[in-house]
């Protein structure tokens, strides 16, 4: 069982529940590619998703934790102005690396393991459609994660 974070333990205590009974389940953002070009395209698509979430004030505590509150406020301003196409450019490679597993197919299992071990008891892996369709990649990834 993975240790529960302090904030999760505090929430459980406030609700009168036993934090030890919880299992943290994670579903990380993924940017994957067979080569650098495909990886870059996947990263760009993920910037769109993350910029939407990061524009929402409910998520600004996450940005503040990393010192990116100004980015959150600018994303929020752009969203209110309907300037959705400008928002992904504000999500840096550093932000992607912080919030997602960014990897070439050959490195994915190792990077996922590094990111999830000690954090989540269970990890849900929602592979992009192209990666999911590549049965060799899926089989190899499962084998590497089980090793």
Where are these regions (language model features)?
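Active-site-adjacent structural elements that line small-molecule/cofactor binding pockets in enzymes
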Residues: 1-147
């Amino acid at each position: 069982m993975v240790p529960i974070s302090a904030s999760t333990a505090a929430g459980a205590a406030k609700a009168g529940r036993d934090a030890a009974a919880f299992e943290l389940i994670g579903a990380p953002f993924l940017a994957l590619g067979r080569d650098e070009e495909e990886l870059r395209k996947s990263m760009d698509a993920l910037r769109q998703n993350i910029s939407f979430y990061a524009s929402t004030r409910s998520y600004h505590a996450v940005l503040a934790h990393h010192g990116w509150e100004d980015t959150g406020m600018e994303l929020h301003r752009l969203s209110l102005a309907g300037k959705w196409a400008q928002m992904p450019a504000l999500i840096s490679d550093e932000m992607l690396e912080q919030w997602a597993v960014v990897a070439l197919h050959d490195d994915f299992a190792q990077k996922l393991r590094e990111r999830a071990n000690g954090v989540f008891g269970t990890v849900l892996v929602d592979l992009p459609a192209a990666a999911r369709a590549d049965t060799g990649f899926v089989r190899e990834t499962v084998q590497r994660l089980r090793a």
